[in-house]
Amino acid sequence: MSSSDSVQRWEQKWSESRLVRRVPADQDAPRRRLELAELNVARAARERAAGDADAALIFAEQALINAADALLARDGYSANSHVVRFSYPRLPAVYVSERGLIDRIRSARNTAQYDARDSVPAGLAAQAIQLAERALGEVRAVL
């Protein structure tokens, strides 16, 4: 099965629920999203150094989203769901190989953002930043 077939099946699966849609080509969109990912990784590192693991993880998770969105934008898509976004077939392998960690990051982000402060372990925040840096590098390499 080709990459095009995988993308076509992905689009068909999610477009009916309106969680993914085609968007007009915008050559600057991938660059803008990568810049935002870089900014969010820097914010994550700054917050971790300041001792705020919650904020560090939230920014690192956002960087993962921004990097994935750069590839989606390059290919003319916009996703309204993390499940949809992170299942895009053309994402670098890190998004598949680290799926368990991404799920833990997402869950911890939800708790930190909506339920309870000081809920993110410092080690998980550090892992989130490392993963965001790795994903950003892999996305940059394929753009």
Predicted feature descriptions by range:
Residues 1-143:
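Terminal alpha-helical segments
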